[in-house]
Amino acid sequence: MAPVTIEKFVNQEERHLVSNRSATIPFGEYIFKRLLSIDTKSVFGVPGDFNLSLLEYLYSPSVESAGLRWVGTCNELNAAYAADGYSRYSNKIGCLITTYGVGELSALNGIAGSFAENVKVLHIVGVAKSIDSRSSNFSDRNLHHLVPQLHDSNFKGPNHKVYHDMVKDRVACSVAYLEDIETACDQVDNVIRDIYKYSKPGYIFVPADFADMSVTCDNLVNVPRISQQDCIVYPSENQLSDIINKITSWIYSSKTPAILGDVLTDRYGVSNFLNKLICKTGIWNFSTVMGKSVIDESNPTYMGQYNGKEGLKQVYEHFELCDLVLHFGVDINEINNGHYTFTYKPNAKIIQFHPNYIRLVDTRQGNEQMFKGINFAPILKELYKRIDVSKLSLQYDSNVTQYTNETMRLEDPTNGQSSIITQVHLQKTMPKFLNPGDVVVCETGSFQFSVRDFAFPSQLKYISQGFFLSIGMALPAALGVGIAMQDHSNAHINGGNVKEDYKPRLILFEGDGAAQMTIQELSTILKCNIPLEVIIWNNNGYTIERAIMGPTRSYNDVMSWKWTKLFEAFGDFDGKYTNSTLIQCPSKLALKLEELKNSNKRSGIELLEVKLGELDFPEQLKCMVEAAALKRNKK
């Protein structure tokens, strides 16, 4: 771990704390000041009786004046999704606050998704007063929101930590159930450090009476900032040189190396260095499904999204030409690895860069070397600095060119003359709708499979739950992304071809079935003045499930809604802040997309309901379903 440095204090209050180290503040205030110190500027959640005393400190003068914002959501699950989206966009810690049992359990699915996809989220849960769990006079009482014992609950007290036990070491990298106010500040800071270190969610259970208790300001004085760089494991100088020398020797001897950009590159904040390395070396580069947009896909040596045998044949063939694969931010799972169909050129060498190891595999010699306990982020930064491009010996096939949207070679049986909107039409049309620097949030659904093979414009940020795949997640995640874009403007842009005065659009691609699960958060987006373009793909139900099984079964149907009438119910009573349009033909879609693409308006919500066929599946979805079926049949 890097040494923690004391940064300069940025305001008068911090200077006051330095001069008065014995100063005390309420613990509730400490929590919110610590959140501000890590650049978490908004908190999501729902009030409940066990967290109200904590929430009151949002309005203490020192916290309120510093700009910490409460974003109340319609339910706790959506708060978890929003906190997830906040972190995915900003690479800061997203935070939600819920109440004992009924609130925290509602959020659990969202937290599980963050855990599965390495998203930094802090879940603060207000629990019963400390005396209720410690005192023999109270601990045997069955409390509301707390499940009783399975047997003899009239005689045995409940397990006050039952929910803590559900999440510890299961969907959280760090959990603190606060019981001693003397160590509470340290426990808060330790959970935050673990969230940064592992890039996974953490929990803090705060007793209702702790918020008002006094704590010292020592931690805020001694460590005024905690950053991800402070929390990851660094190699020694000797280790660093040894690793870099081994990596560069392999690169210099390679004729056809490839860089594979994966999701953990984004989670550990080094995507910019990966793109600099690509620009400096001119090495062919590919993205994974979950690493989509980690690489600037407008670069001249971008070769497409590699997903093994489930990806495009041309991309697969080009990847197979590479004698060395540098896999940055590697995350191995069935979705991200094409149901484990990744293959390499015979005798290729592979280097995997992971937050906990660097792995070098020489398939020709049949051996490998593993450097354990080392985060790849400092390795990537140092590799970019030290690599000598004059020593590269690249000999790529000159007939192979950059991947573009034309590479998809989509077959349209109607030759563009269809009067209905098809998945093929969308794959040809939607990439042109996107501008450099835009932010796209995509729901789990059929269209998500199409987006994989888009060649994105420069500096576009793509956010989607590619592995856990909980439908309904994207809409409240877009709320979190929109809040993060307000708190951390243009955080995703590092150079590229984005116009200097361009204000990025937030675009949500949403399915009708998924939207019905979390649609109410559109009202929160409206309340928070988040500019949003939301496109509802209306194909009358659960299209992915129809592709897998039961295409005409009633269990894949949903009730039809008047999507263009939603906002009157959700708070825009006179239509001043929203505009909704029903689109059923390609020509009308083209006109509307062109209007939005070229508009400078960044206020209000534009909703497009786009009618699609119930049984119209992208080819990428068909391929995945066939691969999954083949895997099932082999068992």
Swiss-Prot record:
Binds 1 Mg(2+) per subunit. Binds 1 thiamine pyrophosphate per subunit. There is a cross-link at K588 (Glycyl lysine isopeptide (Lys-Gly) (interchain with G-Cter in ubiquitin)). Its cofactor is Mg(2+); thiamine diphosphate. Coiled coil: none annotated. One of its GO terms (biological process) is tyrosine catabolic process. It is found in: Cytoplasm. Optimum pH is 6.5-7.0. One of its GO terms (cellular component) is cytoplasm. It catalyses: 4-methyl-2-oxopentanoate + H(+) = 3-methylbutanal + CO2; (S)-3-methyl-2-oxopentanoate + H(+) = 2-methylbutanal + CO2; indole-3-pyruvate + H(+) = indole-3-acetaldehyde + CO2; 3-phenylpyruvate + H(+) = 2-phenylacetaldehyde + CO2. Induction: Expression is induced by the presence of aromatic amino acids and the lack of preferred nitrogen sources (e.g. ammonia, glutamine) and requires the transcription activator ARO80. The keyword Magnesium applies. Fusel oils are important flavor and aroma compounds in yeast-fermented products contributing to the quality of beverages and food. In low concentration they are generally desirable, whereas high concentrations may spoil the product. By adjusting growth conditions and substrate their production is sought to be influenced. Phenylethanol, having a rose-like aroma, is an important fragrance in the cosmetic industry and can be produced by fermentation. One of its GO terms (molecular function) is branched-chain-2-oxoacid decarboxylase activity. Keywords: Branched-chain amino acid catabolism, Cytoplasm, Decarboxylase, Isopeptide bond, Lyase, Magnesium, Metal-binding, Phenylalanine catabolism, Thiamine pyrophosphate, Tryptophan catabolism, Tyrosine catabolism, Ubl conjugation. Pathway: Amino-acid degradation; Ehrlich pathway. Its main location: cytoplasm. One of five 2-oxo acid decarboxylases (PDC1, PDC5, PDC6, ARO10, and THI3) involved in amino acid catabolism. The enzyme catalyzes the decarboxylation of amino acids, which, in a first step, have been transaminated to the corresponding 2-oxo acids (alpha-keto-acids). In a third step, the resulting aldehydes are reduced to alcohols, collectively referred to as fusel oils or alcohols. Belongs to the TPP enzyme family. This is Transaminated amino acid decarboxylase.
